[in-house]
């Protein structure tokens, strides 16, 4: 219960964050709906503040716009999962869910990207077969780290030529 109630605050932050970019969001209505959702979860309970934020804190580590879109995609999915376990007949829950689905459709598939990261973390790097494959791929990985994408290279070359 504590996780869910504190997550409602983060839901507010996400809705407001995307409200600046998605003009179709009615933030006043969403704030009212989120307040009703907070009441449903009794989020004014004292245990909500115990341990500090659980999701907002994670956003601090993701600084670039595309990175944030990946993590926000995961967070939106979490809220949709949380709302699946609530009374969907309530209009405020239905409205929040609809808005979250709309936001989710405008975000990259963060689940796939997170799965890729988890798969990499699980690779048994002491396995000889994995080591062989990794050694075979090392140079191309290093090239991707060193070589800037062509559009950045072209932009930096044109900036160097300009003597303005």
From Swiss-Prot:
Glycans are attached at residues 42, 61. GO terms for biological process: adaptive immune response; antiviral innate immune response; astrocyte activation; cell surface receptor signaling pathway via STAT; extrinsic apoptotic signaling pathway; Fc-gamma receptor signaling pathway involved in phagocytosis; humoral immune response; macrophage activation. InterPro entries: 4_helix_cytokine-like_core, Interferon_gamma. GO terms for cellular component: extracellular space. Keywords: Antiviral defense, Cytokine, Glycoprotein, Growth regulation, Secreted, Signal. Residues 1-19 form the signal peptide. It is found in: Secreted. Transmembrane segments: none annotated. One of its GO terms (molecular function) is cytokine activity. Produced by lymphocytes activated by specific antigens or mitogens. IFN-gamma, in addition to having antiviral activity, has important immunoregulatory functions. It is a potent activator of macrophages, it has antiproliferative effects on transformed cells and it can potentiate the antiviral and antitumor effects of the type I interferons. Homodimer. Belongs to the type II (or gamma) interferon family. This is Interferon gamma.
């Amino acid at each position: 219960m504590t996780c869910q109630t504190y997550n409602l605050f983060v839901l507010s932050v996400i809705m407001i964050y995307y409200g600046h970019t998605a003009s179709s969001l009615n933030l006043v209505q969403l704030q009212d709906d989120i307040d009703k959702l907070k009441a449903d979860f009794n989020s004014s309970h004292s245990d909500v503040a115990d341990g500090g934020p659980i999701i907002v804190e994670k956003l601090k580590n993701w600084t670039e716009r595309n990175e944030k879109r990946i993590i926000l995609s995961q967070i939106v999915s979490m809220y949709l999962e949380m709302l699946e376990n609530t009374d969907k007949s309530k209009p405020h829950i239905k409205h929040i869910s609809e808005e979250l689905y709309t936001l989710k459709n405008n975000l990259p598939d963060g689940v796939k990207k997170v799965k890729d990261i988890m798969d990499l973390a699980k690779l048994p790097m002491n396995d000889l077969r994995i080591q062989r494959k990794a050694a075979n791929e090392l140079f191309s990985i290093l090239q991707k780290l060193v070589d800037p994408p062509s559009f950045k290279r072209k932009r930096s070359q044109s900036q160097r030529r300009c003597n303005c």
